[in-house]
């Protein structure tokens, strides 16, 4: 009998331990070790996210959302351990005439762990915040209006100069709505900005510009070109264009079309261009060829002065056959080994009838096979953005359109998603970026006011009507005594004691009947 009791006791101890371990495993943050993408995590509603990583490995995410009467910029941060801050709206722009505008926020983190951000309503705004305090809305600098516009990007060069590009409509007789790409810079940490310079110089519109500052501090800008540019899209046909500045933004090269044959008819178009730099200092661009649904890439070994002939990225196709989007885009980032990671919505085979969010890696000479970050049936992933933290941790954000409302954003159930993965490049030692606590309210003291004299209390006898004798005093039911906790404890243990007593009684009865 003693052996049986021991086994029962061991089981009673083991079950809680196993159950507790299972719950602890469920509570752990999603892991991205050993080359596995973490399970996509929803950050909230609505669309067009961006991501940047500071020197501690903390990932910062912004996205466009809104509520009744306001269009907002949402912000959340993830620690290297996988803990997320509570999403907050760091900016809220009043809606005009009840019309909603996508705020389209962007992020850039500089070497001093300062976050630089742009967003829009009908104008472009710039702001910044310390990476350790961005989770507190009041730590964001009051926004500064740059000018009317739609798309924007900001970056900081090694000399501390801020560089900002944005699109703004330039009306001409031949094009009433043609958004050009403008460039401004700031030498005083964003307090003031230069006069805008039109760097597109095309008689057409522009959309989705991207800005890269290479290791030699040259500026590179790519964008999608066509008629229009308002509300984030162009009319067909479209092509992709590049310009560069080799003197810190003082002057710019003439626009260069990556494929001159594209953009003249709907039978040959290009969209969704992105640009990166590999570990050898060579530039690489990737763009989407329509309608053949091919992803092309081109490289430059002389800082963009000349480019290779376009070649297809192997083993990956676009999603034109599934969803003819004008608002999507591609994204690139480079890890500590110098490999360029391209993220896009695509397919791996022509027969594939569902979209996937894919990552393909350029090692300086060839592309890796695509790996799947997320796959969908009916829903459509869109607008991915990637950042690399600590040299080898990939952070990817995107949003998803629900199948029922692909082209109806007002009724859509669109959500922003996040996934991460660690790759086999060298890890960079993190630098501490401590969280800045929220400011404490201050007590304002008027030093000019003389202190008031402390009054001397007067004790007076007060007549009491119908006094109650001490023995007749009735205690309120809300007054507690020292014995209350004991009573509560006994009440809590009563069911367990009853069960234990019943078990012992049953055991004794069965033992007595066995010996009878």
Regions found by a protein language model. Give the residues of each.
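Alpha-helical transmembrane segments of integral membrane proteins
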Residues: 7-11, 490-491
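Generic detector of short alpha-helix boundary/capping microenvironments
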Residues: 8-9, 20, 374, 483
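N-terminal secretory signal peptides that target proteins for export/translocation
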Residues: 1-5
């Amino acid at each position: 009998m003693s052996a049986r009791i021991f086994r029962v006791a061991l089981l009673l101890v083991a079950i809680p331990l196993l159950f507790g371990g299972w719950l602890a495993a469920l509570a752990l943050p999603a892991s991205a070790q050993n080359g596995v993408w973490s399970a996509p995590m929803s950050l909230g509603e609505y669309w067009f996210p961006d991501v940047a990583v500071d020197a501690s490995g903390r990932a910062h995410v912004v996205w466009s959302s809104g509520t009744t009467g306001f269009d907002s910029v949402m912000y959340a941060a993830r620690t290297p351990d996988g803990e997320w801050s509570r999403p907050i709206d760091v900016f809220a722009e009043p809606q005009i005439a009840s019309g909603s505008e996508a705020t389209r926020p962007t992020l850039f983190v500089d070497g001093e762990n300062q976050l630089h951000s742009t967003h829009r309503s009908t104008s472009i705004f710039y702001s910044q915040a310390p990476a350790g305090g961005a989770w507190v809305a009041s730590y964001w600098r009051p926004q500064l209006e740059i000018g009317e516009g739609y798309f924007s990007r900001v970056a900081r060069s090694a000399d501390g100069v801020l560089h900002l590009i944005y699109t703004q409509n330039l009306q001409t007789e031949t094009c009433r709505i043609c958004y050009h790409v403008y460039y401004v810079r700031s030498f005083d940490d964003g307090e003031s900005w230069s006069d805008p310079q039109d760097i597109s110089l095309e008689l057409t519109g522009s959309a989705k510009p991207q800005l890269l500052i290479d290791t030699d501090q040259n500026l590179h800008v790519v964008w999608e070109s066509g008629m229009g540019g308002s509300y984030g899209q162009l009319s067909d046909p479209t092509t992709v264009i590049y310009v560069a500045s080799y003197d810190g933004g003082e002057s710019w090269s003439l626009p260069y079309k990556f494929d001159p044959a594209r953009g003249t008819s709907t039978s040959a178009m290009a969209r969704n261009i992105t640009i990166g730099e590999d570990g050898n200092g060579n530039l690489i661009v990737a763009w989407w060829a329509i309608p053949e649904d091919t992803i092309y890439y081109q490289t430059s070994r002389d800082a963009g002065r000349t480019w290779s002939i376009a070649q297809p990225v192997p083993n990956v196709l676009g999603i034109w056959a599934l969803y003819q989007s004008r608002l999507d885009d591609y994204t690139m980032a480079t890890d500590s080994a110098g490999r360029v990671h391209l993220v896009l919505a695509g397919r791996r085979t022509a027969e594939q009838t569902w979209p996937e969010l894919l990552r393909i890696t350029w090692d300086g000479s060839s592309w890796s096979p695509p790996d799947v970050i997320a796959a969908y049936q009916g829903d459509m992933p869109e607008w991915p953005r990637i950042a690399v933290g600590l040299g080898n941790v990939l952070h990817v954000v995107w949003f998803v359109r629900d199948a029922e409302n692909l082209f109806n954003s007002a009724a859509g159930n669109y959500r922003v998603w996040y996934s991460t993965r660690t790759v086999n490049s060298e890890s960079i030692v993190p630098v501490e970026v401590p969280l800045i606590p929220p400011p404490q309210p201050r007590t304002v003291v008027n030093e000019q006011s003389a202190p008031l004299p402390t009054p001397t209390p007067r004790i007076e006898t007060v007549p009491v009507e119908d006094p109650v004798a001490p023995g007749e005093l009735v205690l309120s039911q809300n007054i507690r005594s020292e014995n209350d906790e004991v009573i509560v404890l006994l009440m809590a243990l009563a069911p367990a004691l009853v069960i234990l007593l019943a078990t012992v009684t049953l055991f004794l009865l069965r033992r007595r009947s066995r010996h009878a």
